[in-house]
């Protein structure tokens, strides 16, 4: 099972993230590739995603509802680490509810760092 993301750099009133400058990301599609004959099936996990809705109209029949995924596969669907990393980075700033605290960035969070080799610190990676 592969995660497929819908992204945009033009989502209104959203803060860009990383070098790609994306400001909209969703894990809207799960891709299953049959190991025996290579057929690919795309399952929609976020039917409300406007990009997925557009793809469905442009390529009718390509995307199937998540309910059609076999239960044996559906039980293996996990929350993607990449989305979690993006959300954690955004939440570090946007968890603040008081406008004054937010404006002054008085309660800015950071992802914990782990000491690495040769005095280098690396951000802690998410795990299941």
Regions found by a protein language model. Give the residues of each.
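Accessory, solvent-exposed terminal regions and/or long lumenal/extracellular loops of proteins
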Residues: 51-128
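Exposed beta-strand-loop-beta-strand "reactive/processing" segments of non-cytosolic proteins
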Residues: 1-32, 104-128
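Soluble extramembrane regions of membrane proteins in the secretory/endomembrane system
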Residues: 10, 20-77
């Amino acid at each position: 099972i592969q995660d497929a993301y819908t992204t945009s750099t033009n989502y209104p009133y959203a803060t860009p993230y990383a070098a790609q400058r994306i400001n909209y990301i969703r894990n809207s599609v799960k891709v299953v590739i049959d190991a025996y004959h290579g057929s690919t099936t795309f399952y929609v996990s976020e039917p409300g995603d406007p990009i997925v809705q557009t793809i469905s109209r442009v390529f009718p029949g390509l995307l199937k509802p998540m309910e059609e995924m076999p239960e044996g596969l559906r039980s293996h669907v996990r929350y993607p680490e990449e989305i979690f990393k993006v959300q954690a980075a955004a939440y570090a700033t946007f968890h603040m509810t008081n406008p004054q605290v937010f404006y002054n960035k008085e309660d800015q969070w950071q992802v914990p760092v782990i000491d690495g080799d040769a005095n280098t610190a690396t951000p802690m990676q998410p795990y299941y």
